[in-house]
Amino acid sequence: MESVLSKYENQITIFTDYLEEYPDTDELVWILGKQHLLKTEKSKLLSDISARLWFTYRRKFSPIGGTGPSSDAGWGCMLRCGQMMLAQALICRHLGRDWSWEKQKEQPKEYQRILQCFLDRKDCCYSIHQMAQMGVGEGKSIGEWFGPNTVAQVLKKLALFDEWNSLAVYVSMDNTVVIEDIKKMCRVLPLGADTAGDRPPDSLTASNLSKGTSAYCSAWKPLLLIVPLRLGINQINPVYVDAFKECFKMPQSLGALGGKPNNAYYFIGFLGDELIFLDPHTTQTFVDTGENGTVNDQTFHCLQSPQRMNILNLDPSVALGFFCKEEKDFDNWCSLVQKEILKENLRMFELVQKHPSHWPPFVPPAKPEVTTTGAEFIDSTEQLEEFDLEEDFEILSV
């Protein structure tokens, strides 16, 4: 069995070694909210792309759950894409969108700490072990392929155990983002303001929340906003193409999870009608923390030109990601959505102020009352019963 798996892994590596060069064109390339003029800024573009953390299949890590697989080749691609999206959010949170990575250059301590969150060990908060085991609570067996919505739900639940990054993760439902719910989840009350009377009134609108309300709240919990969508039945509906591309132009953009059936990619931008993506389908050997307490990061950055895909070849089941470090970033995102997304006759998703009356009441997610750490908590899948099962709505074409 091991020899068969090794052969399969090597085959994946060979298939992904070929990366087409970019054409010589005057068109703009958009990468996670930043634009590059391809003809004159190609090296700057490739440097921007290589700074993104790149997570791929790995092998020879400790068996998941003690007796499970020691490689995620063939099934973990969407989990790796989810890791890449989340890692980009953490980069923006601690280092900023304009931070750049250089090979063999000493990096900030925050960078190393971010990287260690994703190592393939059960004690790392966003490891393949944690994600696969949390997926059991979403109805996915360990070793089963995940869809975009399932990965989003897994990240939302794992983030509850991550005190260092302290993210609020909001996953939209029914193609609808609710401003009121996000504000309720992300606002952190001033120290000592623990009574209901100290909470900001729910009636505040998106327009006046950005100004004149700072007295109500001293802090904003950084927001990872994930919007799972289905943009067609068996293939993407062309009516959504322009709105989908607009999302990559937003400064809050974290790209998109998607791809083709059973083949997930992390989409980070576009050139014309081609989506630019990082491909996790390369199998590399597990990397652990070194004796000096740091991680050798050379295999966590893609140093070749990334691949491209015509947007109409994209499977319609996707998940958009956005990061809003401050409340003003979220207010700006709402304005951009109103201007660029909601103007369409057939809207990609809805943005509403109030919580829909026919929905169950919104309860901000909270860490379950357990005495163990997050890593230990999901080491026992029986304890996943404390989480509600989220419906995995995506229906991938076959």
Curated annotation (Swiss-Prot):
One of its GO terms (cellular component) is cytoplasm. One of its GO terms (molecular function) is protein-phosphatidylethanolamide deconjugating activity. The active site is at C77 (nucleophile), D279, H281. Keywords: Autophagy, Cytoplasm, Hydrolase, Lipid metabolism, Protease, Protein transport, Thiol protease, Transport, Ubl conjugation pathway. It is an enzyme of class 3 (hydrolase). SUPFAM superfamilies: Cysteine proteinases. Interacts with ATG9A; the interaction is direct. This is Cysteine protease ATG4A.
